[in-house]
């Protein structure tokens, strides 16, 4: 399964735009599923994140809030990709035993 990145953002938010630029740049070089969620699309989502955008989740784990560091984001995504590959290899080895 591909690594999932969910970005909770709001239009007109400078930090959100900066975060999406970093995430998009990394996405060009690394395979992961990216879902950009506008917090104004749902009242529930808006209530949860209106005071903390951008909020970035990697594989369901809150990884960044307000500021996304490009190097740290790259490391975290790379680590999740490696873990997924190891799980795939391990499951294949178990199938052949």
What are these regions (language model features)?
Residues 1-25:
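Local sequence-structure signature of Cys/Sec-based thiol-disulfide redox active-site neighborhoods
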Residues 4, 29-33:
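A generic structural signal for alpha->beta connector loops
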Residues 17-21, 47-48, 68:
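Generic recognition of short, well-ordered alpha-helical segments
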Residues 32-43, 50:
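Thiol-based oxidoreductase modules, predominantly thioredoxin-like and allied folds used
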Residues 53-63:
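A short, hydrophobic beta-strand/beta-hairpin element that forms part of a small beta-sheet core
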Residues 61-87:
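Non-catalytic, surface beta->alpha helical segment in thiol-disulfide oxidoreductase systems
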Residues 84-97:
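Secretory/periplasmic and organellar redox-cofactor proteins
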